């Protein structure tokens, strides 16, 4: 049985995935390095504003590397959340299909439908975050390439 656990932006908020339904709540702090990277990136961005672009020319590659690492980890976290939400959505669909005909009263079906749509909304938010982080990855890589070409000329 394989258990994968990913950490969100907050130190005590794990997002868990497991190959077995009973182990969905397991947690291991695998991605704790995400928080220091976020802090370092924000500090460096503030320092660039404070001291100017020319003073930070040598630190730009490091800042780009931090942005890439942070975007990659956040992307991995969002993909894990997406998998978890897809699993929850499939469980709700299974519950709706498995309801015996005599138990298919309106209240139970409505409750399951509400849960399904709430999870669907969360999925849309996660997919939006995935797209945002892909954009960050691509723009950072583009900026890095432009800087390297400019330095070569």
UniProtKB/Swiss-Prot annotation:
Highest taxon of the lineage: Eukaryota
Record's keyword annotation contains Lipid metabolism: no
Record keyword Phosphoprotein present: no
Stretches assigned to coiled coil: 113-151
Pfam families attached to this UniProt entry: JMY (PF15871)
InterPro entries noted in UniProt: JMY/WHAMM (IPR031738)
Keywords assigned: Coiled coil
PANTHER family named in the record: P300 TRANSCRIPTIONAL COFACTOR JMY-RELATED, WASP HOMOLOG-ASSOCIATED PROTEIN WITH ACTIN, MEMBRANES AND MICROTUBULES
Protein name (Swiss-Prot/TrEMBL): Putative WASP homolog-associated protein with actin, membranes and microtubules-like protein 1
Chain's gene name: WHAMMP3
